[in-house]
Amino acid sequence: MLHTRTIALLLVGLVVLVNAQTFQYSRGWTNGKRSPLSSSSSSPSSSAAMEPLTANQLLASALSSGGLNSLKPSEKALLRRFLRNPCDLRVASLLAAAHPTKELFPLAGNSFDSAESAGAAFVLPPFLMDPDESNGGIGGSNLANGRSMEDELRFKRGTATGFSDHRQKIA
Protein backbone atom coordinates (compact mmCIF):
# COMPACT_ATOMS: atom_id res chain seq x y z
CA MET A 1 0.00 0.00 0.00
CA LEU A 2 2.89 2.34 0.76
CA HIS A 3 4.48 1.64 -2.61
CA THR A 4 1.21 2.37 -4.43
CA ARG A 5 0.88 5.76 -2.72
CA THR A 6 4.50 6.58 -3.44
CA ILE A 7 4.14 5.71 -7.12
CA ALA A 8 0.88 7.67 -7.37
CA LEU A 9 2.49 10.68 -5.65
CA LEU A 10 5.49 10.52 -7.98
CA LEU A 11 3.24 10.34 -11.05
CA VAL A 12 1.15 13.31 -9.86
CA GLY A 13 4.34 15.27 -9.18
CA LEU A 14 5.68 14.44 -12.62
CA VAL A 15 2.44 15.57 -14.29
CA VAL A 16 2.53 18.85 -12.33
CA LEU A 17 6.16 19.49 -13.32
CA VAL A 18 5.49 18.74 -16.99
CA ASN A 19 2.46 21.04 -17.01
CA ALA A 20 4.46 23.80 -15.29
CA GLN A 21 7.28 23.51 -17.83
CA THR A 22 4.80 23.52 -20.72
CA PHE A 23 3.14 26.64 -19.31
CA GLN A 24 6.50 28.39 -18.95
CA TYR A 25 7.50 27.43 -22.47
CA SER A 26 4.21 28.68 -23.93
CA ARG A 27 4.74 32.04 -22.21
CA GLY A 28 8.34 32.31 -23.35
CA TRP A 29 9.67 32.13 -19.80
CA THR A 30 12.34 29.51 -20.44
CA ASN A 31 15.98 30.28 -19.64
CA GLY A 32 14.99 33.04 -17.21
CA LYS A 33 13.33 35.26 -19.83
CA ARG A 34 10.37 36.74 -17.99
CA SER A 35 7.83 39.06 -19.56
CA PRO A 36 8.58 42.76 -18.89
CA LEU A 37 4.88 43.35 -18.17
CA SER A 38 5.33 42.09 -14.60
CA SER A 39 7.21 45.24 -13.57
CA SER A 40 5.14 48.36 -13.11
CA SER A 41 7.76 50.71 -14.58
CA SER A 42 7.78 49.15 -18.04
CA SER A 43 6.23 51.11 -20.86
CA PRO A 44 4.39 49.60 -23.85
CA SER A 45 7.11 50.80 -26.22
CA SER A 46 9.84 49.03 -24.28
CA SER A 47 7.84 45.82 -24.12
CA ALA A 48 7.27 45.95 -27.88
CA ALA A 49 10.99 46.43 -28.42
CA MET A 50 11.79 43.36 -26.32
CA GLU A 51 9.41 40.99 -28.12
CA PRO A 52 11.19 38.29 -30.11
CA LEU A 53 11.11 38.46 -33.89
CA THR A 54 8.59 36.24 -35.59
CA ALA A 55 9.41 34.18 -38.66
CA ASN A 56 7.70 36.77 -40.88
CA GLN A 57 9.81 39.58 -39.43
CA LEU A 58 12.96 37.51 -39.86
CA LEU A 59 12.14 36.82 -43.50
CA ALA A 60 11.34 40.47 -44.16
CA SER A 61 14.54 41.60 -42.42
CA ALA A 62 16.55 39.05 -44.39
CA LEU A 63 15.50 40.68 -47.64
CA SER A 64 17.93 43.37 -48.68
CA SER A 65 16.63 46.92 -48.50
CA GLY A 66 17.55 47.42 -52.14
CA GLY A 67 15.51 44.36 -53.03
CA LEU A 68 12.44 45.70 -51.24
CA ASN A 69 12.75 49.13 -52.84
CA SER A 70 12.98 47.62 -56.31
CA LEU A 71 9.71 45.69 -55.95
CA LYS A 72 6.57 46.91 -57.69
CA PRO A 73 3.46 47.59 -55.56
CA SER A 74 1.81 44.40 -56.82
CA GLU A 75 4.94 42.42 -55.91
CA LYS A 76 4.98 43.96 -52.43
CA ALA A 77 1.32 43.00 -52.03
CA LEU A 78 2.15 39.45 -53.09
CA LEU A 79 5.04 39.33 -50.60
CA ARG A 80 2.78 40.59 -47.79
CA ARG A 81 0.19 37.96 -48.71
CA PHE A 82 2.87 35.25 -48.70
CA LEU A 83 4.12 36.37 -45.28
CA ARG A 84 0.57 36.15 -43.92
CA ASN A 85 0.02 32.64 -45.31
CA PRO A 86 3.23 30.91 -46.41
CA CYS A 87 1.36 27.63 -47.01
CA ASP A 88 -0.59 29.04 -49.97
CA LEU A 89 1.28 27.36 -52.81
CA ARG A 90 -0.24 29.56 -55.51
CA VAL A 91 1.21 32.68 -53.91
CA ALA A 92 4.54 30.98 -53.23
CA SER A 93 4.90 29.78 -56.82
CA LEU A 94 3.99 33.21 -58.20
CA LEU A 95 6.48 34.85 -55.88
CA ALA A 96 9.23 32.41 -56.83
CA ALA A 97 8.40 32.69 -60.53
CA ALA A 98 8.51 36.48 -60.41
CA HIS A 99 11.95 36.60 -58.80
CA PRO A 100 13.96 33.42 -59.25
CA THR A 101 17.19 35.23 -58.28
CA LYS A 102 18.91 33.98 -55.17
CA GLU A 103 19.96 37.39 -53.81
CA LEU A 104 16.36 38.57 -53.37
CA PHE A 105 15.37 35.55 -51.29
CA PRO A 106 18.54 34.43 -49.49
CA LEU A 107 16.72 32.00 -47.19
CA ALA A 108 15.14 30.06 -50.05
CA GLY A 109 16.99 27.45 -52.02
CA ASN A 110 17.60 27.73 -55.72
CA SER A 111 16.15 24.30 -56.43
CA PHE A 112 12.74 25.70 -57.42
CA ASP A 113 12.15 24.97 -61.08
CA SER A 114 8.86 25.84 -62.69
CA ALA A 115 7.48 26.27 -66.17
CA GLU A 116 6.17 29.66 -65.02
CA SER A 117 9.69 30.99 -64.37
CA ALA A 118 10.60 31.14 -68.06
CA GLY A 119 11.11 34.91 -67.97
CA ALA A 120 7.47 35.99 -68.29
CA ALA A 121 6.54 39.43 -66.97
CA PHE A 122 5.21 39.51 -63.43
CA VAL A 123 1.42 39.87 -63.37
CA LEU A 124 -0.47 39.44 -60.13
CA PRO A 125 -3.70 37.52 -60.86
CA PRO A 126 -6.81 39.49 -59.89
CA PHE A 127 -8.09 36.79 -57.55
CA LEU A 128 -4.93 37.20 -55.44
CA MET A 129 -5.27 40.97 -55.13
CA ASP A 130 -6.62 42.42 -51.92
CA PRO A 131 -8.80 45.49 -52.49
CA ASP A 132 -7.65 47.06 -49.21
CA GLU A 133 -3.98 47.04 -50.23
CA SER A 134 -4.38 49.91 -52.74
CA ASN A 135 -3.35 47.85 -55.73
CA GLY A 136 -6.50 48.37 -57.73
CA GLY A 137 -8.47 45.39 -56.51
CA ILE A 138 -10.71 43.51 -58.88
CA GLY A 139 -12.39 45.56 -61.56
CA GLY A 140 -15.17 43.13 -62.39
CA SER A 141 -16.58 39.80 -61.44
CA ASN A 142 -14.85 37.99 -64.33
CA LEU A 143 -11.12 37.42 -64.56
CA ALA A 144 -8.90 37.93 -67.60
CA ASN A 145 -9.33 34.29 -68.63
CA GLY A 146 -13.13 34.66 -68.73
CA ARG A 147 -13.84 32.63 -65.59
CA SER A 148 -15.49 34.07 -62.53
CA MET A 149 -13.50 34.32 -59.31
CA GLU A 150 -15.56 31.54 -57.73
CA ASP A 151 -14.63 29.22 -60.61
CA GLU A 152 -10.97 30.16 -60.32
CA LEU A 153 -10.84 29.41 -56.60
CA ARG A 154 -12.73 26.13 -56.90
CA PHE A 155 -10.86 22.96 -55.98
CA LYS A 156 -12.39 20.87 -58.76
CA ARG A 157 -12.45 22.54 -62.15
CA GLY A 158 -15.02 20.14 -63.62
CA THR A 159 -17.89 20.93 -61.26
CA ALA A 160 -20.90 23.06 -62.14
CA THR A 161 -20.62 26.84 -61.82
CA GLY A 162 -23.60 27.27 -59.49
CA PHE A 163 -23.15 27.42 -55.74
CA SER A 164 -26.32 25.59 -54.78
CA ASP A 165 -24.35 23.30 -52.48
CA HIS A 166 -22.44 25.09 -49.70
CA ARG A 167 -19.89 22.26 -49.57
CA GLN A 168 -18.48 23.38 -52.94
CA LYS A 169 -17.27 26.71 -51.55
CA ILE A 170 -13.82 27.18 -50.13
CA ALA A 171 -14.04 27.99 -46.44
UniProtKB/Swiss-Prot annotation:
GO MF terms, alphabetically ordered: corazonin receptor binding; neuropeptide hormone activity
GO CC annotations on file: extracellular region
Protein's UniProt keywords contain Secreted: yes
Proregion span(s): 82-171
Signal peptide bounds: 1-20
A GO BP entry: neuropeptide signaling pathway
Keyword Lyase included in the entry's annotation: no
Sites of Pyrrolidone carboxylic acid modification: Q21
Keywords in alphabetical order: Amidation, Cleavage on pair of basic residues, Neuropeptide, Pyrrolidone carboxylic acid, Secreted, Signal
InterPro entries named among the record's database cross-references: Procorazonin
Pfam families linked to this entry: Corazonin
Residues recorded as bearing Asparagine amide in the entry: N31
Family: Belongs to the corazonin family.
Annotated function: Cardioactive peptide. Corazonin is probably involved in the physiological regulation of the heart beat.
Protein name per the record: Pro-corazonin
Origin species: Anopheles gambiae (African malaria mosquito)
